Structures are given as structure tokens and as C-alpha cells.
């Protein structure tokens, strides 16, 4: 792979185009509207989440919650001035937890269809002692401080803009000392969209960006 890799080639070879489209375009938002938040990221609405939690508590239980996460991670590396690695990883799934006394049941699914989520809920709820279905409260969104006040998401920065930045770092390192002959520079970033909903009615969403620039 040479240093002229295009964004189209990067997205195509890494199969991240659809994942990037699946994440909500809400840079710096600690909470989002229902239409542009959890539904866009996971394809679920509050009614479906309530049904899943109700299924988790069908046999009883003190509490149940469901955790959704959609993470897109990319990495670009430069060695001897040329791109030698470009990767992209996608993580998508949901976990259902049921608590009864000191017992906890947990099940996970990478498929976010209603059938798969209800199946995970049933598996997690199997630890309950069949004491009768417990209720699910009305959801109320919680707000939290914006710990990631970015003006531009990394997923919006094309490879054509990343490569020149890495080359500037490469040239600065080589120019800092004549004894430096070889430099490796890499940029890794990730964005996670998270949703947690509990049978007690708590509903929280978060967007978690991270980035790391490495030089050796």
C-alpha cells in the first residue's frame, strides 16, 4: 500500500463505510434526540427496549438493564514516509443483565433484531426464581456533562487529510536529530455510541471519542 491511498479505497477495503453511516452525526453531544440518537445507532426504539426488559423480568427479578454499544475504530500507520497499514474495526452488540438477590444473569447478542434481543433477555432472566413478572418503569432520559466537546469527529476526517498530518510528524521527528534514521508514526481513533436502559426507568446515552498519536 503506497502513500496515495484514497479515502474511498480505505473505506472499501476496511468495510467501514456502512458502520460510519450507522453512527449518529452528533459530535460533542452527551445526549441526543430519540430520532437521531439510539434509533440511528442501533435501530431500536423505547417500545422495543421496554419489551426486551419485560421479557428479561418475565420470571421475576429485582432489576434488569440492557447495554448497547456501537464502536468504529480506525488506524493508519506510516513507515519510511509511506502508509504501510490501514485498518478498521467494527463492534456492535447488546448485553442484557438480570439481578435477583445476589444472583446475576447475563446474555449478549451481536444481532440487534427484536427476536435476538428477546432471546438474550430470556437467557439472562433464566436465573430468576419464577416469582412472577416484574414491572418496567417509564423511561426518563438522564443528562450528563459533555466531556468530549469536539468541533469535528475523527470519522469526518478523510485519509487524504490524515496522511499529510502523519508526514509532518514524520518529517519533524527526522529533522529533530541527525541520528534519527527511521521513524514510525501511527494514528488510531475510535468512536463509541452507548445506550443503557434499566427497568427502573433510567435511560442514558453517551458518545465516546478517543484518539492516539504514536511516534517511535
For the regions a protein language model found, what residue spans apply to each?
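Active-site bordering "gate/hinge" segments
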Residues: 2-216
Amino acid at each position: 500500500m503506497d502513500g496515495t491511498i484514497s479515502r474511498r479505497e480505505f473505506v472499501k477495503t476496511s468495510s467501514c463505510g456502512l458502520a460510519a453511516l450507522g453512527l449518529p452525526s452528533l459530535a460533542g453531544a452527551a445526549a441526543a434526540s430519540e430520532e437521531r440518537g439510539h434509533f440511528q445507532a442501533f435501530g431500536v426504539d423505547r417500545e422495543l427496549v421496554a419489551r426486551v426488559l419485560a421479557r428479561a423480568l418475565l420470571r421475576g427479578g429485582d432489576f434488569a438493564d440492557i447495554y448497547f454499544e456501537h464502536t468504529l475504530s480506525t488506524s493508519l500507520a506510516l513507515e519510511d514516509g509511506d502508509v504501510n497499514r490501514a485498518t478498521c474495526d467494527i463492534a456492535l452488540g447488546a448485553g442484557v443483565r438480570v439481578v435477583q438477590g445476589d444472583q446475576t444473569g447475563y446474555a449478549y447478542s451481536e444481532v440487534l433484531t427484536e427476536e435476538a434481543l428477546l432471546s438474550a433477555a430470556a437467557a439472562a432472566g433464566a436465573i430468576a426464581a419464577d416469582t412472577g413478572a416484574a414491572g418496567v418503569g417509564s423511561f426518563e432520559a438522564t443528562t450528563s456533562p459533555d466531556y468530549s466537546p469536539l468541533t469535528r469527529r475523527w470519522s469526518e476526517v478523510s485519509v487524504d487529510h490524515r496522511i499529510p498530518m502523519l508526514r509532518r510528524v514524520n518529517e519533524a521527528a527526522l529533522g529533530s536529530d541527525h541520528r534519527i534514521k527511521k521513524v514510525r508514526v501511527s494514528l488510531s481513533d475510535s468512536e463509541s455510541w452507548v445506550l443503557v436502559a434499566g427497568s427502573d426507568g433510567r435511560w442514558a446515552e453517551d458518545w465516546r471519542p478517543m484518539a492516539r498519536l504514536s511516534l517511535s
